[in-house]
């Protein structure tokens, strides 16, 4: 509708290894648009600016290029854009990195299953089996599968867009623990949230 409207203007962002940088603001402030424009220009048509990873200038014109450069974006809309609810956990977990579980474009079902079980255990996802459809999980466990999907791409930089929206207090705590673990491993995290206490830690 307003294709010429400038959504994000004159933003500088620095994120170090092992650091969480928080972005907060009201709905419509351009937080998600900024994140998606960084992640392979997946939002917007007139994107300008420069992006450096480890001091090296990179051009990320597609989502595939962003993933290859070890960037990950965990969307705020897990049901609409993040997960395929009618598919099992194992398929959703490996979806962003099919090359790692396939040979000559044929998926190794054992590898797919083992990767999903590994992340189920790592993130303490509560489900009887990774053969279960993601749509049957609670919000918190769906969010863990979404995180697992992007962790499996081995990113250096994770953009987490409202990672605790629509989940209970216990699941929120577990998500915070996962973020802390990622930071301890030297990952860089950009966290977007409309909850100021969450951003302030």
Model-found features: residue ranges?
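Glycine-rich phosphate-binding loops of nucleotide-dependent enzymes
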Residues: 1-201
């Amino acid at each position: 509708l307003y294709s010429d409207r400038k959504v994000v203007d004159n933003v500088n962002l620095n994120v170090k290894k092992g650091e969480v940088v928080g972005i907060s603001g009201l709905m419509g402030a351009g937080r998600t648009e900024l994140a998606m424009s960084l992640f392979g220009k997946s939002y917007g048509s007139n994107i300008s600016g420069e992006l450096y990873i480890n001091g090296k200038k990179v051009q990320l014109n597609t989502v595939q290029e962003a993933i290859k450069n070890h960037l990950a974006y965990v969307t705020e809309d897990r049901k609409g854009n993040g997960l395929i609810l009618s598919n099992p956990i194992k398929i959703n977990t490996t979806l962003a990195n099919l090359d790692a579980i396939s040979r000559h474009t044929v998926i190794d079902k054992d590898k797919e299953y083992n990767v999903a079980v590994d992340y189920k255990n790592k993130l303490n996802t509560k489900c009887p089996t990774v053969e279960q459809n993601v749509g049957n999980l609670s919000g918190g466990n769906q969010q863990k599968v979404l995180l697992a999907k992007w962790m499996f791409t081995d990113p250096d930089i994770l953009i987490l867009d409202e990672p605790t929206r629509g989940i209970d207090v216990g699941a929120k705590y577990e998500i915070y623990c996962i973020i802390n673990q990622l930071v301890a491993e030297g990952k860089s995290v950009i966290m977007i949230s409309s909850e100021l206490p969450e951003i302030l830690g």
